[in-house]
């Protein structure tokens, strides 16, 4: 049984197209309304307060402790784990610091061997973490 043909079939064809759209993965993701329930709620970055510094064990076959921070977002109070990139950058982050968090690749999925971590730290107290790491800037005294 194919699609309806004929001069009066417009409404039926339109209705069929609307129902079939929901079979498309990308359409479903953008129109279901779940984006607002995610921690960032449709934005690329978010500010948060560092609750604690944590080490997350890497998945097999790797063996390492990935340095992360537990962060509570200011906009909605949700608590997330954020990866701290580069060697020794965890030393620039203290508890109760304000950090800027961004996504970590893969469209909301965990990256590499770090289980359950979907975000990374970009700035600490308004200063880029990369600038602190390269010693181009200093962290402001609070």
Swiss-Prot record:
Query: What's this protein's name?
Result: Small ribosomal subunit protein uS12z
Give the family, as the similarity comment puts it.
Answer: Belongs to the universal ribosomal protein uS12 family.
Molecular function as annotated in GO: mRNA binding; structural constituent of ribosome
Could you list this entry's UniProt keywords, alphabetically sorted. Hydroxylation, Ribonucleoprotein, Ribosomal protein
Residues modified as Hydroxyproline: 61
Tell me the GO BP annotations in alphabetical order: translation
Cellular compartments per GO CC = cytosol; cytosolic ribosome; cytosolic small ribosomal subunit; nucleolus
Pfam families assigned: Ribosom_S12_S23
Q: Does the keyword Ribonucleoprotein apply?
A: yes
| Coiled-coil boundaries | none
The organism of origin for this protein: Arabidopsis thaliana (Mouse-ear cress)
Q: Gene3D superfamilies from the xrefs?
A: Nucleic acid-binding proteins
């Amino acid at each position: 049984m194919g699609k309806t043909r004929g001069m009066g079939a417009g409404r039926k064809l339109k209705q069929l197209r609307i129902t079939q759209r929901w079979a498309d993965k990308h359409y479903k993701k953008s129109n279901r309304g779940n984006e607002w329930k995610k921690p960032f709620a449709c934005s690329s970055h978010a500010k948060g307060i560092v609750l604690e510094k944590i080490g997350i064990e890497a998945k097999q076959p790797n063996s390492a402790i990935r340095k992360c921070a537990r962060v509570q977002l200011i906009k909605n109070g949700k608590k997330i784990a954020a990866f701290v990139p580069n060697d020794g950058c965890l030393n620039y982050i203290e508890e109760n610091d304000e950090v800027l968090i961004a996504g970590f690749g893969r469209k909301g999925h965990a990256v590499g061997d770090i289980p359950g971590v979907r975000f990374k730290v970009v700035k600490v107290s308004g200063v880029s973490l990369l600038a602190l790491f390269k010693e181009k800037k200093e962290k402001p005294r609070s």
